[in-house]
Design a protein with these regions (language model features):
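Start-transfer (signal-anchor) and selected internal transmembrane alpha helices
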Residues: 1-26
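Short alpha-helical segments and helix-capping/turn motifs at coil-helix boundaries
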Residues: 2-7, 48-49, 108-113
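Juxtamembrane loop-transmembrane helix junctions in multi-pass integral membrane proteins
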Residues: 4, 90-93, 119
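Membrane-interface helix-boundary signature
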Residues: 6, 10, 95-98, 158, ...
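Residue-level signature of transmembrane alpha-helical entry/exit and packing/kink sites
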Residues: 7-14, 103, 124, 148
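Membrane-interface coil-to-helix junctions
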Residues: 20-107, 129-156
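Membrane-embedded helix bundles of polyisoprenyl
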Residues: 107-117, 122-193
Length: 193
């Protein structure tokens, strides 16, 4: 029991360390300051006409705007996301101040990814820092490619999930039938398995 609490304490400490690193990199967000993202300012200009129309006509939202390229569909600019059941979960995961929350989610996911490939906790923390703070991530945060950064933040989570699932599938009885299902039973001597 004591050993279990010790392990939980170590991982809780690592999570707090990763949160400290994420928000230590952008402490200004804790004071309410925001990153001036040029693409977000551009989006506000692109979407303004459609947003104003939709606010004035909630029963008849527009699917077209004249504010870009002489006219274009609004689905590429703004859309109605009612009925998206993942939104509450997503808001919970990204509940911190942005861009600190992007960095924290990336750090935590990359830490799990490093653990999934069998690295030590220390090396996993170092690898997570390398993944989260690569120069591309900093560039896309600065210009305002927020949805791209959010997608990148979840890449390590997905990869770690696949690896952990694969490793779990290799345990126990599954190990005996997996080669047959993947490569075909004709390649194996049935008595050897």
């Amino acid at each position: 029991m004591v050993e279990t609490f010790k392990k939980i304490g170590i991982y809780a400490g690592i999570v707090l360390l990763l949160a400290g690193i994420a928000y230590g990199f952008v402490p200004q967000v804790l004071d309410g300051k925001i990153v001036n993202q040029s693409d977000i300012a551009g989006w506000k200009g692109m979407a303004q006409e459609a947003l104003e129309y939709n606010k004035a006509n909630p029963d008849d939202p527009t699917a077209w705007t004249g504010s870009m390229f002489g006219g274009m569909p609004t689905t590429a600019i703004t859309d109605n996301f009612e009925g998206d059941w993942t939104k509450p979960l997503y808001k919970f995961i990204m509940m911190g101040k942005r861009p600190g929350s992007y960095l924290f989610v990336t750090l935590l996911g990359a830490f799990l990814l490093m653990l999934s490939i069998g690295t030590s906790k220390t090396l996993a923390v170092a690898g997570a820092i390398a993944v989260a703070f690569c120069s591309y991530n900093m560039q896309i945060i600065q210009v305002g490619h927020n949805t791209k950064m959010q997608a990148i933040a979840f890449f390590p989570w997905v990869l770690a999930g696949v690896i952990f699932t694969y490793k779990a599938a290799l345990g126990g009885q599954i190990r005996k039938w997996l080669p047959k299902t993947v490569l075909g039973a004709v390649l194996f001597d049935k008595t050897a398995l």
